Amino acid sequence: MTNPALWSAQAHMPSVIGRQINVVSGKGAYLTTDTGARLFDATASLWYANIGHAREEMAEVAYEQMKTLEAYHVFGRYTNNRAIELSEKLVSISPIDDPKVILNSGGSDSIDAALKLVRRYWNQVGRTNKKVIISREHSYHGLHAYGTSVAGLDYNREGYGSDSLVEGTARVDKHDVGDFSATIERIGAENIAAYIAEPVMGTGGVHPPRKGYFAEIQRLCRENDILFIADEVITGFGRTGEMFASTRYQLKPDIIVFAKGVTSGYAALGGILVAPRVWQPFFEKGKSSPIYRHGTTYSGHLVSSALALKNLEILEREGLVARSAALEQILASELKSIESHDFVTAARIGGFMGCVELSNEISAESITDRLIEYGFITRPLRGNAIQISPPFITKDQEVRDLLSAVRTVLDRAKPVCRMGKAREKIAI
């Protein structure tokens, strides 16, 4: 294919043309390409295929809902039963007490919904200077304009003629609480609307929080009247062995952002859980209550909501959140054993999501390309790391086989020459 019609996401098109992998079917934790290759999905696609691919009961739910009503919006006076049922279910499992639910079409939508809402909230309560959003270096918060602007991945903000598409953002060190404190002092708490963070940083290289980090961050947020947003687009719905990572890491967010695992990828859906402090001004002032002017065409989509409900039922019925916690222990053991490899600089884990970070002399992208030949789909992350985050239905041995393949590929990546610790570029 020399000139494809499809412009792939996040792709250097001249490099991928002619080497694209066309995935045509899946079953469980495996995918099949148009060449007949059967590949283990070691990343659960983009962190979301938690219950595995091509479950017939999910297809049946979609079919039955479409036969009744495929979609209807939830703007103004209108609503629908599936959106109501899903919202009630999410409230019942939320780490936030008595939240309200805003539904939309995915993670990037949800980030924009959360960030716009905190700006609107502060204006409503008369604190109109509180506009700045603080995030962490190397963080990823989607690719809509606001998410791109707050992201800590510099390469996602480059090329648009300004540091931020939306003004009023700042980034702090991902581990250093002191940097956050200094940034509050520099910008002024009276100007800061919110702090946003992934409980476990994903695309930035799978960085779990250091002990005590979020306790101190939350203390500073409370003391300085800064709203705290937990971006659980990746970690939500079992990825860290709890339904939400906020529970595991004892977070008390004002807003939780979710997507991905809420449907396990069977339909596009995301949303936010909003704490009473933030939602009350929009509900409890009668005629003087403001309207939050936000919504998407497919907010509360019936088929997506029905699939989310079935997905949550499957997670509970099959004990897959507990299974994720058990798989974390297997993955942790395997990562510990690979950490001593000559080409590995670190192996990190936070829930059933981990990464193998490689030395600069070898390319994570090249290793992930080679792993496809061994039957495993992985993905390069920031920091020259390899993403590992399989579905929750993965077998213990499949985790071991995956890490065995990583070791084999690293073992066969021979340096051109070696002089003590100084090495030439690796040829693989």
Question: Where in the sequence are the language-model features?
Answer:
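Conserved N-terminal phosphate-binding loop of PLP-dependent enzymes in the Aspartate aminotransferase
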Residues: 1-428
